C-alpha cells in the first residue's frame, strides 16, 4: 500500500516485552492517524462488519473478548488485503436492564420512577447513560478493536429511532404487526412482558400432586405442580387415543374449590404416559394450555394480577401471593379428600427473569405482535438458496428448526425506557400509526408501551448505515460482509435481523455470511457462571499478560461453532509466545537482519535459507485459506508452530554460524524477510506487539497500512527441505544421545561427523556443530551414534564418569530383566491366566512390552559407552 513512509523509528528494542508500555501509545497512534476510518467514496471493494451492540449497562466479559477478537482479526486482515474495511461500533439501549439500573438508584433514595413521572425518568436515564454508560467502549480500546469510532451508533439515536418508526409503520400497513391477547412471559417484579432471551431456565425442585376432579358420577384425576392455577381451569384434557378416558370425553366434571363445571376434551398434545395422562387446562396462565384452549374454545379465566397475586377467583385465596396460594390450595384439597396422591418430588425447568431472578408467570395479556410467518419464510429462503451462508454449515439445521417453527413475536414491553410504540388511539376507538415527522391529531393518546429491545437491534445492519435514507454508506457497505456472533443468539438476534433486513431492503440480505463461534467455558469445560464462581475478567488478564496474549489464546481456541475451554495457564503461554517473538526480533536486529533490498535468487541461497522461505510460503498460503474459512484455531496453531519451532528453534539456531561468518548478508536479508512476513501474518491476531516490532524492524510508519503477505508456492525448494530435515534428524538424535548419557545440554563435547558428504551436508557442518555445541578437538572418539548414512563419534572424556555411568546402566538393565522375567512367568502360568481379571492381565502384558523396550534401549546405551 502507498503512504507507509519511513518514520525513523528503527531503534534498538528494549530487552524485555512490556505490554503496558506500548498498548495505549499504539492505539492512540492508530486512532489519531485515522487508520480505522472507512470511506464510502472509496473505489476499493467493501468489507463490512457491524458489531453486535453490547448493552449500554454492560462491561467487557470473556464472550465479548472472543467475539471482538474474531471481528477485529477479520477487519484488520481485509484492510491489509486492500478492502475498504468498516467495522461499525455501537451500543444497545438495553431497555429493561437500563431501566432497572436507574430504578435501583432511585430506590436507594426512597423514590420510584412514578414519583418522577415518565418524561423526567427518561431524562434521568439519558443522564445516567452519558455519565456512566458505555464503560465497554473504553474496554474495547484496551482489546485493540479497530472500529470506526466516527460511526459509533446507539439504538436510541435520532436516526435509529427514525428507522424504528419507519419500519413499524411499514409492517403495520402490510398487516404484519397486530395487537392481540396472547400468553407472554411476564415478570411480576419488573411488571413487563419479556422476551425469551431474557428468561433463564433453572431446574426447580417442584412437587407433583394428584388431585381428583368431579363427583361420584363423573370424576378424573389430574397431576400438577401448580395447584394454585386450578382455580382458573377451563377444561381437563386427555389424549384421544387413551382408552382409559375415551368414555369421559365430552362430559363435564366438577372443578373443586370453585364448584364450576368444566368439559373433558381430547387433544393430541396430551402425553398419555405423563402423570395420570389427564391434564388441567388453564388457558389464561400457560402457553400450551392457551393453544389447546384456542382449538377447543376453552374459557379464559384470569386468576392472578400483574404482581403475581391471586385475584378474581371468588375464593378465600384472593389476595395471596401465588406461591403461598399453592400451599394453601393443596392443604384445602387435602381436607376435602381430593388429594389422591401426596406430594412427589419433581425437578423441572422453570423460567426466571434474567434481570431480577423473579419466577416468570405465563400471563394472558393484550400485546403487540409481529406476524412472523412471511418474514421467517424469507429468512429461511435466503439461507436455502445460498444468498446467506452459515459457518459452520452444520449449524444450518438449527437455524431452519427455529425459522421454520417460529411463533409470532411479542414486541411490546411495559417499560418507559425504549422506543415508544408509535400507535395512537382516538377518542372514538380510532387507531393510527405515526411514522417519522408525523403527528397524531389532537385528542389522540399514544400507547404507553415501548418496543422490545430486540426490535431496534434487529435493524442494526442497515439503520446504522443511514436507512431509511438512501445514503452513500448504505450503497457502499450493505449488505454487510459477515456477522460474527455466538451460536447462542442465532435465534434471538440473528434471525430477527434476517427478517427485518430482507423486509426493509427489498430482499437484500443484511449479511452474506453468518460466522458462528462457540461459548467460552472454564478449563474443565463447564459453563461459566457467577454461582459456580468460575467466571473470569478479561480486563484482569489483559492487565497481567497483555491484550495480545488474551486475543491469541481466544483465537487459538476458536473453532467454528464449537465451545472452547479457557485456563489462565494458556494465556500465560500466549504471553510466552509473544516474548519469544520479541526476543527473536531483537536477536535478528542485533545480527544485522534487514528488509532493505531484494532477496537473493533462490539458487544463490543456502539450504537453510531456502528451507525457511519454502516453509514461510506454505504457512502463508495455508493460514490465509484457514482465516478465510473462519478456521481461526487451525490458522493460529499453524502460525504458532512455524514461529516457535521452524523460525526460532531451528532456523535461528542453524543460522547462527552463518550470521557470525563473513557471508552473512544474504541470510540477514532472508531473516528480515521472514520476520516481516510473519509479523504481517500475525498482526490481525496480535496487533500491538506486531506493530511495535514491525515498525522497529522496518523503520516504517505502520503495519496497519501495509499489504497482507502473499505466498509463492512456485518457488518451493524440496531439495533444501530434505536437507534441513536430515539436519533436524541428526540434531535430534545427537541431543537424545547426550541426554541418555547424562551430558548437560549446555556442555561442550568433542565430536566427529562422518558421511555428511554422502547426504549433501558437508557445507553445513559448522551449523550442526554450533547448534549441538560439538567441538572438533579430539582424536579419542570412543562412542558413536548413527543417523542413516551419517555417523557421529564422540569423545566423552571428562563429560561423564564412565565407571559410574556403566554401573548405573548395568543396574537398570538387570532390574528391567528381572521385571520382564516376572511378567513372563505370570503370563505363562495357565492357572493364573484362567483366574486373573482382564485388567490385571492387560497391565502385566503392558509391563512386559515396556520392560522389553527398556532392555533394548539400555543394552544399546551400554554398547555405545567407551570400553
Task: Describe the role of every protein-language-model region.
Residues 21-39, 241-242:
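Amphipathic alpha-helical blocks
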Residues 42-44, 52-53, 86-99, 152-160, ...:
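Short, solvent-exposed turn/loop segments enriched in Gly/Ser/Thr/Pro and often Arg
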Residues 3, 210, 401-455, 459, ...:
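Feature 926 captures the class I aminoacyl-tRNA synthetase adenylation module centered on the KMSKS loop
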Residues 39-102, 164, 223-225, 229, ...:
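N-terminal catalytic cores of NTP/NDP-binding nucleotidyl/phosphoryl-transfer enzymes
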Residues 260-265, 448-478, 645, 649-652:
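Active-site-adjacent "gating/activation" loops or surface patches in catalytic cores
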Residues 76-84, 105-118, 138, 142-147, ...:
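Secondary-structure transition/capping motifs at alpha-helix termini
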Residues 2-5, 11, 16, 25, ...:
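Residue patterns forming the tRNA-binding/recognition surfaces of aminoacyl-tRNA synthetases
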Residues 84, 227-307, 330, 334, ...:
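Catalytic alpha/beta core of large soluble enzyme barrels
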